[in-house]
């Protein structure tokens, strides 16, 4: 089993997908992979507010979960893992919907240039959410 390296994310350097330090990717505005998940229950969408300790966009309201896959991690595995790590959500099977790309200055000298795999998941009426205070408010 490979040791987890959450600091290394897939980013393109000179046209080649390469493991890159997450902070470097944002400082240099490197095009990199990301994952975005929207969990729905009926007509409701679960949103979260980013923790104030996050190194960029703290306190920002966002979708259910947005993150970066680790190097050698599939987008779907990443989505499932981060739902549990950020919100304590299990039993939701993310379904791939589309891929988008965007570039945005997020302040503090950081740039998001993401190729985002979008997922949705259906929540049961009895689903519980246990927010991780290091991740969400």
PLM-predicted stretches and their roles:
Residues 2-36:
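Acidic, metal-coordinating catalytic segment for phosphate/diphosphate chemistry
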């Amino acid at each position: 089993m490979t040791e987890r390296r959450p600091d290394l994310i897939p980013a393109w350097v000179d046209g080649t997908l390469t493991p890159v330090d997450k902070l470097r990717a944002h400082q240099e505005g490197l095009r990199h992979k990301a994952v975005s998940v929207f969990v729905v229950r009926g007509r409701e969408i679960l949103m979260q507010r980013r923790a104030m300790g996050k190194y960029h966009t703290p306190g920002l309201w966002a979708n259910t979960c947005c993150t970066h896959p680790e190097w050698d991690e599939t987008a779907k595995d990443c989505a499932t893992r981060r739902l549990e790590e950020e919100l304590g959500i299990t039993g939701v099977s993310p379904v791939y919907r589309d891929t988008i790309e965007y570039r945005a200055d997020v302040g503090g000298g950081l740039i998001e240039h993401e190729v985002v795999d979008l997922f949705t998941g259906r929540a049961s009426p009895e689903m519980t959410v246990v927010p991780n205070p290091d991740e969400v408010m």
